[in-house]
Each structure stands twice: as structure tokens, then as C-alpha cells.
Amino acid sequence: MNVLNRNINNIFFIFAISHLIVWTLIPSLTNKNLPLDTIEALAWGSNLDWGFNKHPPMSAFFSQIFFNIFGSQDWAFYLLSQIFVVIAFYYVFKFAYEILKDLKLSLISVLLLVSIYFYNFTSPEFNVNVCQLPFWSMVVYYTWKIYNSKVVNFSDCFFVAIFGAIGFLSKYLFIYLLVSIDLLFIYLIFFKKLKKFDFKYIITLEVFIVLLVPHLIWLYDNDFVTVLYGLKRTGLEYGSIINHFYQPLIFLIKQFGILIPFFFLIWLLVKKIKFKFNLKDNKLLFLIAINILPIFLMLLTSIITGSKIRTMWMTPFYLFFGVFLVYLLKSHIDLKKINSFLIGFLFLFFLSPSIYSYVSISQTDKRTDYPGKEIALKAQITWSQEFEKEIEFVTGDEWKAGNLSYHLKSRPTWEGLTTDKILKDSSQFICIGDVCLGRY
């Protein structure tokens, strides 16, 4: 039995490493330039702060760490994305075993995620959505340990607070997971009386809030610009009564569309799709809280506000759907059909990078076809003809100026949009189109 378990663990690690290698190599070989969101994160990372006009700071922080190690090597940032994805897979695998107590089913729970395009096709672009993934999975894992233990361990509470704060500082929508977990514990402690309140829960909240304080101060000092940007992205300013029905319907249709390949793999694995919900089952209750409740809260947000929920915002929400469905259907899973499942899995595993490669090579007008290196070289030549010292800052939008900040050897700081004040305060500057380069 130990040999069998060791083999399954090895299969998981082979899958994880294969995923990491494939999705690092494919975009590295087929893309000419880093994607928009990654360039934005690098632009912010050149001038780190506790927040930025579009997002909280963590995606910029991790991007800058990798830049400090590897410099302007595109493959390093595709690798960064896949490290985050694979860490998430690892904690899904660990959690699945806690729930299922079967390594084969735990492995299947992770392999099912290959059918959800958030974890392959869109994963090369390191952004706030990918940045949430490992912390989402770790919060769920350590929350489960608290939920399933008779004695609450302080270290588990501490990890939930730390990873919850980092997740929230990656993207505010992380709050949907945290609220879902809170609602679960409130239900069990104050309504069902199935758990006792533990003061370590307060410590979790305190640590979480303390870690957010610098960002909250930054938000206040900057007129809550990040929050306003997020609200603008929902289309609330164009709201109408019909949006309270139309937007939730579109949201549901998109979620179903995303999961079609997922249900196809499930169909290959089971004898029949039949299950029943027993809310007295503590494991099932937890799985509903981390899988269904965050999506329901997102749907409820759309219904109440009429807001548009963008598809990519749902990136971390499906990490544990494999565990959820395998748990529901485990009595109907037919391991004799495992070969059919593996064929379907391998088909999707290779289909996604094949499509990515085809799109990347055949379409030549994408952001990833932007000649960032060439433009940076021309900008450097233009600067060098005027000045001897190196470039210290760039201004302009995150895309054009961010590419210059990334590709120029001096790694100039991105100072935001060009303003008269920045140029007046500089000792030297030149402007090329709508981008300016200068020295302090």
C-alpha cells in the first residue's frame, strides 16, 4: 500500500512539473513580449508602494522579486505564474486527501483542473488573478485544519490570517472566500451550536487587519483610487434595472460554459451522475462553503447591484471543484473507466498549449507581439545622443512606459502618467511621443 501511495505521489509531482515546464516553455517560445498585466505589475514593481491605481500591491511585489533575481528575462515571469499555479495544485492535492482519504481520488481531483482554462490557457499571464491562487488554496487548507480539529491550533489560525491578508492584497475579490468561511463558522457556532467559539479566531482577525493597515492608510491617502477602479470595471455607472437580471444571467451562462470540459471529464469517470446533499455531513458542508458559497455571493452581488462580473475574476473560485465533485460522486466513480478518463485528460492537457501556440504564432496583432525590446533600444539610442548619464525614470501609461522600464538596462522607475510637475522637477528629460524619459 505504501508503494502504491508513493507511486501516486510521484504521478502528482510528474504532472505538476510537466505542467510547469510546458506552460513556461510555450509562451516563452511563442510570445515576443510579456502580456499586458505582467508588464503593468512590473511597472508598479519598479516603484513599489502599498497600492496602485488598479490593484493592491502583491502582484507587483512578487514580480519585482523575480526581476531582482532574473532581470528582464521573459521566461522568468512565465515561470513565476506556473510556480503559483503548481503551489495551488499542491495544496488542492493535500486538501483532497484530507477529505477523500484516498490518494487515487485525490490525484483525480487535481487532474480535473486541467479542464478549466483558468489553470492552463490563461495562466502564463502573471497578474492579480494568478497571484491569488496559492493563497486561496492555502487559506482553504488551513481553514479545514481548524474546522476539522477538536483543539484549535494557533499556527493554523496564524497561517489563515497571513495567507488571507496576502490574498486580499493580491485582489480584493479574495474577500468572497473569507466571507464564505466566516459565514460557515458563524452558522456552526451561533446557530447550530456544533462548534465552540475559540478566542484564537479573534487573533486570526487581528493579525489579518494589522497586515492590511499599511494598505488601508495608502488607500485613504490616495482617495480610495483602487476601490473606485474596481467599481468602474463592474459597469455600475451605466446601470439600469434590466442589468439586475441580464448581468446575473450572463454570469451564470459563462460559468456553465467554463465548466463544460470539466463535466466532460467527470462523465468519462463515473457510472452515473447521481448524488444527494446531506448537510449533516461536515465535509460536504465545508466543500459547499468554499466552492458554492463564494460563487453564490458573487451572483448575489450581480443581482443586487446589476454589476458585470468579468470572467477572469473567477480564476481562483474553481480550484476545489474537482474535490467537491469527486466527493459527491465517489460512490459512482468507476476506476475501470480510468483509461477513458486519462485519455480525456491527456487530450485536454496537450490541446490547451497547442491552441495557445497556434493563436500566439498565427495572430500578429496581440499585446504579446509588441516590439518592446526594439522600442526600448531606440529610446536608449535617442537618450544617449542627448545625455551621458543613465535613465532614472519613465512616465506614460503602464503599457508603453512599463515596457521601457522593463527592457531598458537601467531599469528606470515608472512614475505614472506624464505631468508638468514631474518634468519640471527632473534634471534632464526627453519625450518620445506620449512617453517621457528622465533623471531626477
Language-model-detected regions and their locations in the chain:
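Signature aromatic-anchored transmembrane alpha helix within multi-pass, membrane-resident enzymes
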Residues: S331-V359
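Membrane-interface alpha helices of multi-pass inner-membrane proteins
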Residues: N47, D156-Y172, L183, F208-V210
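Transmembrane-lumen/periplasm boundary regions of multi-pass, lipid-linked membrane glycan transferases
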Residues: L178-K283, P294-L299, I304
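Transmembrane-helix motifs of polytopic, lipid-linked glycan transferases
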Residues: L79-L100, S137-Y142
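Short helix- or helix-capping micro-motifs
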Residues: A16, S109-Y117, G164, F168
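Short periplasmic/luminal acceptor-recognition loop of GT-C membrane glycosyltransferases, typified by
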Residues: D365-L437
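Short acidic/glycine- and proline-prone juxtamembrane loop motifs at membrane-interface regions
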Residues: F121-Q132
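Membrane-interface transmembrane helices that cradle and orient dolichyl/undecaprenyl
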Residues: Y97-L100, V139-D156, L329
